A protein has these predicted regions:
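Short amphipathic alpha-helices in soluble, non-transmembrane regions
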Residues: 29-33, 65-73
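Surface-exposed aromatic
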Residues: 49-55
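RNA-recognition motif
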Residues: 43-49
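Short amphipathic alpha-helix segments
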Residues: 20-37
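Helix N-cap motif at beta-to-alpha junctions
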Residues: 57-62
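Short glycine-/aliphatic-rich beta-strand segments at the starts of folded cytosolic domains
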Residues: 4-22
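Conserved short beta-strand edge segments in small beta-sheet-based binding/regulatory domains
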Residues: 43, 74-81
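Short amphipathic beta-strand starts and helix->beta connectors
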Residues: 1-3, 35-41
């Protein structure tokens, strides 16, 4: 009898409110964040009243401080929720 072991990696997610208001601005910032964090899953929800940014990482913690620094460097207000 063959048994298999499935390793499950934990995923960490950080959620931020932002001042991003346009798709163009979101796409620009996504490019900048993906350059710095190619392994993160990153997306915006601009339909939410807080213009949510979600950042997920599998197997390691999200570097929230660096995400905030990159966003602020590009003139975006951001706050971790």
């Amino acid at each position: 009898m063959h048994s298999s072991f499935i390793e499950q990696s934990s995923k960490t997610v950080e959620v931020f409110s932002t001042s991003v208001s346009s798709i163009e601005q979101a796409e620009f910032l996504l490019d900048k964040l993906q350059e710095e964090f190619p392994c993160y899953e990153i997306n915006f929800d601009l339909e939410d009243c807080d213009n949510i940014l979600r950042v997920a990482s599998v197997g390691s913690n999200v570097d929230a401080e660096m995400v905030i620094l990159i966003m602020e460097k590009h003139g975006t207000e951001i706050q971790i929720l």
